From Swiss-Prot:
GO BP: any one term: mismatch repair
Protein name stated in the entry: DNA mismatch repair protein MutL
CDD domains: HATPase_MutL-MLH-PMS-like, MutL_Trans
Highest classification ranks of the organism: Bacteria, Bacillati, Bacillota, Clostridia, Eubacteriales
Matching Pfam families: DNA_mis_repair, HATPase_c_3, MutL_C
Family to which the UniProt record says this protein belongs: Belongs to the DNA mismatch repair MutL/HexB family.
Gene this protein is translated from: mutL
UniProt source species: Clostridium botulinum (strain Loch Maree / Type A3)
HAMAP family: DNA_mis_repair
A Gene Ontology term for the protein's cellular component: mismatch repair complex
Function as written in the Swiss-Prot or TrEMBL entry: This protein is involved in the repair of mismatches in DNA. It is required for dam-dependent methyl-directed DNA mismatch repair. May act as a 'molecular matchmaker', a protein that promotes the formation of a stable complex between two or more DNA-binding proteins in an ATP-dependent manner without itself being part of a final effector complex.
GO molecular function, one term: ATP hydrolysis activity
Length: 666
């Protein structure tokens, strides 16, 4: 074994500098943070050759006392803390006392500083960690520090520096983050004698965002905030139209400190998930104010990462705040269209006590997926229904709060609300003698017949009692213009033109419906006339075994059929007529790409998303009744504005928008 050597101070300082000072932008970051901690309100940064030749920081902060000038450049000399306990109560940007010692050991450094209580300041010059002189000087209150010839005495580090253009870009980026974090401070970046960035310290975050980005982005922001006992989350998120293909426009600040956090980024992006298209990343500037004892900032040499005491609670707080803000913005955009006061509903809260429960059964109606039988996606072409006895025997449900549904009634878990339409008259006139059989084949797309609901007191009656709709104001001022290209539905309402993507809209309806069935535990399955046998690889079979309960709860009946072979006997009824093998393998592939620790909710959502393949397609010609039914289904949803993949389900043009297009108005 080699002899153990004690390194001299110069060597240890250079090694430490390698951890703290990676590139010129690291110097700018450390020195500007010192200026902020000193209470500066105006900070000027001058650079030459990307900071490799010169970095100069001028601030109007409190300055450094003459007696402390020399000590400021000693390793681990700081005015921020006295003991290790202070780290967990720290509210300043810096605290380790490493920056000045590290910077001065690998550069030529000159510092001038004066405090308000002195008529003169002090100037110190250090070259390669050695003090060349210390003298009195005249200067303004505050501090000016010049760092030149960075890494001049560390050739190994010098040759790995990037181009001056690249380093200038990195410095601009970190200055922009400071502008966002501190809207009340004026920052001025001068590159090669020319002003590059200028902020005015107005204290308005939106002004800072406009300064850093542009007018378009500043005009497409959504404000959000959430305040809890120990944490406040607030800031701005961008509307979907300003999303980008990279994460460069994302900023996270914890107690005003710019940090990078995968889990905070994930919380925001998950909140955006159903509002953005695939591979698009949202714009956001998010601030997290939290008591210092609940975070640890001493986990990275550059303090660019933090640890939270309770990441789960943090994730939920951020997710909820962002998600509600997005939903609120979209809801406001379509207020006139989705005015649910216009929808006539029957609130059955008073009759909840009259309901009883049934045990869940499986659907016993086999459906041949290869036949030409078609199910009307909106359930309008079924002439006759099975008897009450048959319904109770054949349809598996968990709730026995039964009303005839025919895909036109909806129930809310919290406050049972039944939605009815003009089929009510027909249903009320039916008695069980008419329910002998279904004479017509089921039409295309009724892939999700809802559970039927009967009133407890009428299950033995010869008719089904349904609360009758006396009026429905929703359609009074709504005009269905028709379809464009058999893909987009055109609707006029309240002097506004709505264009609905029929595929995206129906996709969202099916997604929410299937997801709701999974959550409530009564997914209706269909028995396949010919079970589908699939031979899996060992890896695929292991993924299936790991997620077999997910498949079961989603309406799939799957049995092992050999060492790595499975036999699919039932699939969710909502899927209609899928290619069972392809669908199953698609779901398996999605589950494979998820982490094993992903929650079951995320996995169910993935399955529900794939289930949307049975939605109506572009170029499908819809009747007016079908269009109305699709709109009714959308009205029930909490978030009908985007499909499961993040595409918009509709867009709106006001009369003013159209008149501007035709140059009728300015």
């Amino acid at each position: 074994m080699r002899k153990i050597n004690l390194l001299d101070l110069e060597t240890t300082n250079k090694i430490a500098a390698g951890e703290v000072i990676e590139r010129p932008f690291s110097v700018v970051k450390e020195l500007v943070e010192n200026s902020i901690d000193a209470g500066a309100k105006n900070i000027t940064i001058e650079i030459e050759d990307g900071g490799q030749k010169l970095i100069k920081i001028i601030d109007d902060g409190e300055g450094i006392y003459p007696i402390d000038i020399k000590n400021a450049f000693l390793p681990h000399a700081t005015s921020k803390i006295n003991s290790i306990e202070d780290i967990y109560k720290i509210s300043t940007m810096g605290f380790r006392g490493e920056a000045l010692a590290s910077i001065s050991s690998v550069s030529k450094t000159k510092l001038k500083s004066r405090v308000d209580s002195y008529n003169f300041g002090k100037e110190i010059y250090i070259e390669g960690g050695k003090i060349e002189y210390l003298k009195d000087t005249g200067c303004n209150v505050g501090t000016t520090i010049e760092v030149s010839d960075l890494f001049y005495n560390v050739p190994a580090r010098l040759k790995f520096l990037k181009s001056a253009r690249s380093d200038s870009s990195s410095i601009s980026d970190i200055v922009n983050r400071f502008i966002l974090a501190h809207p009340d401070i004026s920052f001025n970046l001068i590159n090669k004698g020319k002003q590059s960035i200028k902020s005015y310290g107005t204290g308005n975050l939106k002004d800072s965002i406009r300064c850093v980005y542009n007018k378009t982005i500043s005009e497409n922001l959504i404000n959000f905030e959430s305040h809890k006992d120990i944490i406040s989350v607030y800031g701005f998120i961008g509307k979907p139209e300003i999303s980008r293909k990279s994460r460069t426009n994302q900023s996270i600040f914890v107690n005003k400190r710019y940090v990078k956090s995968k889990f905070i980024t994930a919380a925001v992006e998950n909140a955006f998930k159903s509002f953005l298209t695939v591979n698009s990343y949202p714009f956001f500037v998010i601030f997290i104010d939290i008591f210092p004892e609940y975070i640890d900032v001493n986990v990275h040499p550059t303090k660019s990462e933090v640890k939270f005491k309770d990441e789960r609670a943090m994730f939920k707080t951020i997710f909820d705040a962002v998600h509600e803000a997005i939903k609120g913005e979209l809801k406001e955009s379509f207020t006139n269209f989705f005015n649910k006061e216009d929808i006539n509903i029957y609130d059955s809260e008073k009759s909840i006590a009259e309901t009883i429960k049934l045990e869940k059964e499986e659907v016993q109606i086999p459906i041949d997926l290869n036949s030409n039988n078609k199910i009307d996606i909106f359930g309008n072409n079924i002439n006759k229904l099975p008897t009450n006895t048959e319904v109770l025997k054949n349809i598996g449900i968990k709730e026995k709060n039964i009303l005839e549904n025919n895909d036109n009634f909806y129930t809310s878990k919290q406050n049972e609300i039944y939605y009815t339409n003009k089929n009510d008259e027909y249903l009320n006139s039916c008695n069980k003698d008419d329910y002998s059989k279904i004479e017509k084949p089921l039409q295309k797309g009724n892939k999700n017949p809802d559970a039927l609901y009967l009133n407890e007191h009428n299950t033995n009656s010869s008719s089904i009692n349904i609360k009758e709709n006396k009026s429905n104001n929703f359609y009074v001022d709504m005009k269905i213009i028709g379809q464009f290209n058999n893909t987009y539905i055109l609707i006029e309402k309240d002097k506004e033109l709505y264009i609905i993507d029929q595929h995206a809209a129906h996709e969202k309806v099916l997604f929410e419906k299937f997801k709701s069935e999974i959550e409530k535990g009564y997914v209706i399955s269909q028995i396949l006339l010919s079970p589908v046998v699939i031979e899996l690889s060992e890896d695929e079979f292991n993924i299936y075994e790991e997620n077999k309960d997910i498949f079961k709860n989603s309406g799939f009946a799957v049995e092992n059929f050999g060492e790595s072979t499975i036999n699919i006997k039932e699939v969710p009824l909502i899927l209609g007529k899928p290619n069972v093998e392809n669908l199953f393998m698609d779901i398996l592939y999605n589950l494979k790409n998820m982490k094993s620790k992903e929650t079951s909710t995320i996995k169910y959502n993935a399955i529900a998303t794939l289930a949307c393949k049975s939605a109506v397609k572009a170029n499908d010609n819809l009747k007016e009744e079908e269009i109305k039914k699709l709109i009714e289904d959308m009205l029930i949803l909490n978030n009908p504005y985007t499909c499961p993949h993040g595409r918009p389900t509709m867009i709106k043009f006001t009369l003013k928008d159209l008149e501007k297009k035709f140059k009728r108005i300015q």
